[in-house]
Each structure stands twice: as structure tokens, then as C-alpha cells.
Amino acid sequence: MPKRGKKYLEALKLVDRFKAYPVAEAIELVKKTNVAKFDATVEVAFRLGVDPKKADQQIRGAVVLPHGTGKVARVLVFAKGEKAKEAEAAGADYVGDTEYINKIQQGWFDFDVVVATPDMMGEVGKLGRILGPKGLMPNPKTGTVTFDVTKAVQEIKAGKVEYRVDKAGNIHVPIGKVSFDNEKLAENFATIYEAILKAKPAAAKGTYVKNVTITSTMGPGIKVDPTTVAVAQ
């Protein structure tokens, strides 16, 4: 385990690791325990009662946060003809087809999200082994395989985030920056929490949301009582 700095250890003293804090209080504590010298990202981690090894308990989706994440994503769109023009008009950073497939195969990754029209997926599929492990492969479940490229690009630019359960049953999602107003962080939290509740697989048994933790980059984790989310909104 890496050695923690003095500032981190001081911040840790402010947190009761056995307590699940109300959302509003947890957000305030995240700011107090932030030790980064930059505008740190605030992230929420959900530990879910699902078995990701089972196909009927996979959780994946996307949601537009009302106040964004504080980062404007660079969007690559695979499209041709009119759809390519629509993507450019919507604000996509890169639009094209085979030339970008070749660039990616050569190691180019100056983008954060990939969108593709369905007719391009035959070609984009060649990038599965490259984009898949990085979580960048377009997917209908996250709205990134679509003919409505205008909506897709605009939502991503507005603060759409993807969420996906990992092998351990956890979901990690950024909800903003420590510089955000507390109310905005709370509303973003409420939005992603509601989306994850709606995404509960029918096959999931027992307690669905087992644990929720909020943290800032380099800061300590703070347990959250998600049932207080209505109070925080």
C-alpha cells in the first residue's frame, strides 16, 4: 500500500469511516478533505449486489448529468455523408470513417467518447480489441450507436456520463469538480443514483445498493447514506 502524505492523513481524521453520511454532509466533507492542488474530480462509487459474471446481471448505461462533470469530452464520430455533416454541426471534434480507423490502429487516442452510426459498425467492429478494453467501443445501450448523431454529440458535450459495473460489482462515476456548488454536486449525485436504481436487473437478489462512497481525487473515501438523496436535491 502506498505511503500516504501528511495532508491526506490529516484529512482522514475528519472522516468517521464507520458512519454513512447524509448526501449534503458527505459533499461538504469531500471539499474539506480535498488535498489536491488542482480542481479535483468528485467521484461516486457504488457497490452493488449483482453477479457481473451472469449475463442477466450486467449493468451498463448512460445518463446526462444536469450540471455536467466539469470536463468537456472530445467526441469522435464515425459517420458518412449527411450524418457526418450533422455530427460536425453538432460540435463533434473529429468526424470521419476509415481514416480514423487507421489512425486508431496506429495508436491515436486523442478522444474521450466514440459515436458511430449503425451502418459504420461493420468497420468500427475491427477496433473492438483496441477500443473495448478502454471502454470506448460504441454501444447501443449507452446511445453511442445511433443515426441521431446530433442528439448523441450534444448530450455528450452537455455532460453525459457512462456507467458500467466492473467484475467486482462496482460502478465508478464522476459527478463534477470540487469547485462545483454543493447543490449542483447533490443534483448530479441524485441523477446518477436514480439511473442506477432504474437499471437494477430483475435477476438481482437481496440488497441491490450495498455501499456508496464519495471521494475527490487523492482524497479519502466518505460513505454516503443514499436514502438521504431526496433531502439533498
UniProtKB/Swiss-Prot annotation:
Q: Which residues form a coiled coil?
A: none
InterPro entries the record matches: Ribosom_uL1_bac-type, Ribosomal_uL1, Ribosomal_uL1-like, Ribosomal_uL1/biogenesis, Ribosomal_uL1_3-a/b-sand, Ribosomal_uL1_CS
- Keywords assigned by UniProt? Repressor, Ribonucleoprotein, Ribosomal protein, RNA-binding, rRNA-binding, Translation regulation, tRNA-binding
Q: Quick one: a GO cellular component term?
A: large ribosomal subunit
Its GO biological process annotations read:
regulation of translation; translation
| GO MF, one example | structural constituent of ribosome
Q: Pfam families, per this entry?
A: Ribosomal_L1
What CDD domains does the annotation carry? Ribosomal_L1
Spell out the NCBIfam families in the cross-references: rplA_bact
Give the family from UniProt: Belongs to the universal ribosomal protein uL1 family.
Q: What does this protein do?
A: Binds directly to 23S rRNA. The L1 stalk is quite mobile in the ribosome, and is involved in E site tRNA release. Protein L1 is also a translational repressor protein, it controls the translation of the L11 operon by binding to its mRNA.
Return the HAMAP family for the record: Ribosomal_uL1_B
Question: How does the annotation summarize its subunit structure?
Answer: Part of the 50S ribosomal subunit.
UniProt protein name = Large ribosomal subunit protein uL1
State the organism named in the record. Geobacillus thermodenitrificans (strain NG80-2)
Q: What is the lineage of its organism?
A: Bacteria, Bacillati, Bacillota, Bacilli, Bacillales
